[in-house]
């Protein structure tokens, strides 16, 4: 059983993930924001548990992903750390420290390691901040560097950004070469893993072949990469929008939750004992 394997296996390390690439074994990453989910995904045998700054939009109802602060990310990461025993724990930088320069980025990385016990830090838009990647890597902190196709890079190379999200997209050779170059520079700066956003089946394999470190993808990724990253809540269909408009996921937890809470309401209204409450003796 997967959980039996996960509970007896040795902790996942960066070295182990890099060996998985060399062996041709796919890497699995899941985004988690709380202690309960962390325990479950760790038991399932994922390789990476990533604490995403997407917690603001998906769990707290923020309208802007930039609202999440460093202190908030530390609180969330500490909770996830308590639930993860085997998988490698990564955390997203919130907006701010990376943009403030290498010194600020290094201070933030050190805080995540010292205060939250992370194994790796993830830098969004890392291709624009190679000095920060290098500074953190020199300090001995593993860096998970995100890069990829953005509306800006698509426009620069004369293509429609939305077209790059299709599985059969054919990217201009100049854009593929640009992305390969970014990946190589991030590897040279000291990144130990890459998160390639909107890789597609053309640039994705090219980047995978160009670097020795694992290339993982969430949005716009596919089996052409060394592994995949998925939000835990998305994988199980846990979003209010999924009640009326369910997506193709591995479960429909939002619908199950609605049915369960509706049943709870019915039991209370009808004067019945609720499930999981203190048993009531029948007279």
Protein language model annotation of sequence segments:
Residues 2-283:
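Alpha/beta enzyme core
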């Amino acid at each position: 059983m997967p959980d039996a394997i996960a509970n007896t296996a040795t902790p996942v390390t960066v070295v182990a993930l890099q060996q998985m690439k060399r062996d041709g074994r796919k890497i699995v990453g899941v985004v988690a924001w709380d202690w309960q989910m962390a325990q479950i995904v760790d038991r399932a045998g994922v390789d990476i548990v990533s604490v995403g700054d997407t917690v603001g939009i998906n769990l707290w109802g923020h309208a802007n992903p930039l609202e999440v602060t460093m202190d908030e990310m530390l609180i969330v990461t500490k909770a996830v750390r308590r639930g993860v025993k085997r998988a490698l724990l990564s955390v997203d930088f919130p907006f701010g420290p990376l943009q403030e320069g290498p010194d600020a980025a290094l201070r933030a990385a050190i805080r995540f390691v010292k205060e939250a016990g992370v194994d790796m830090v993830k830098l969004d838009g890392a291709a624009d901040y190679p000095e920060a990647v290098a500074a953190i890597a020199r300090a001995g902190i593993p860096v998970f560097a995100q890069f990829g196709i953005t509306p800006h890079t698509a426009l620069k190379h004369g293509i429609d950004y939305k077209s790059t999200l299709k599985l059969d997209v054919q990217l201009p050779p100049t854009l593929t070469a640009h992305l390969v170059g970014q990946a190589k520079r991030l590897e040279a700066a000291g990144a130990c893993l890459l998160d390639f956003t909107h890789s597609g089946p053309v640039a994705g394999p090219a980047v995978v072949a160009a670097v020795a470190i694992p290339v993982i993808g969430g949005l716009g990724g596919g089996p052409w990469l060394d592994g995949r990253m998925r939000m835990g809540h998305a994988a199980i269909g846990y979003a209010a929008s999924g009640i009326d408009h369910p997506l193709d996921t591995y479960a429909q937890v939002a619908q199950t939750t609605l049915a369960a809470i509706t049943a709870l309401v019915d039991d209370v209204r009808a004067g019945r004992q609720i499930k999981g409450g203190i048993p009531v003796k029948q007279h």
